[in-house]
Design a protein with these regions (language model features):
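Polybasic phosphoinositide-binding surfaces of eukaryotic membrane-targeting domains
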Residues: 9-24
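Acidic, Ser/Thr- and proline-rich intrinsically disordered linker/docking segments
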Residues: 1-10, 27-93
Length: 93
């Protein structure tokens, strides 16, 4: 599988290789975070009335959460990666 990359806003990059998600420039992360699907927890908040959405991903074995705040349009572009990550998490459990 090729690495997928999605630029979110003007400062956040999300990459996915089918096993590991990597987030650079997230709101609640220092630098970048790499999390393998086998130990990941994912939460997606759909856009609110103002069009603001959010996703968070963390290693289930620690409490450091990586939070990405984004627009509804960015969420739509990121949706294929998040759906694949959710499927990989479900398969790993």
């Amino acid at each position: 599988m090729e690495i997928q990359e999605v630029l979110v806003g003007d400062r956040c990059l999300v990459t996915w290789d089918g096993k590991v998600i990597e987030v650079f420039g997230a709101y609640a992360a220092s630098g970048g975070r790499r999390i393998h699907a086998a130990v990941a927890e994912l939460e997606v908040r759909e856009p609110d009335k103002k069009g603001r959405a959010q996703f968070s991903v963390k290693n289930a074995r620690d409490q450091q959460n990586t939070i990405v705040q984004l627009s509804g349009d960015d969420l739509a572009r990121l949706r294929p990666i998040l759906d694949e990550l959710a499927a990989a998490i479900a398969t790993a459990r």
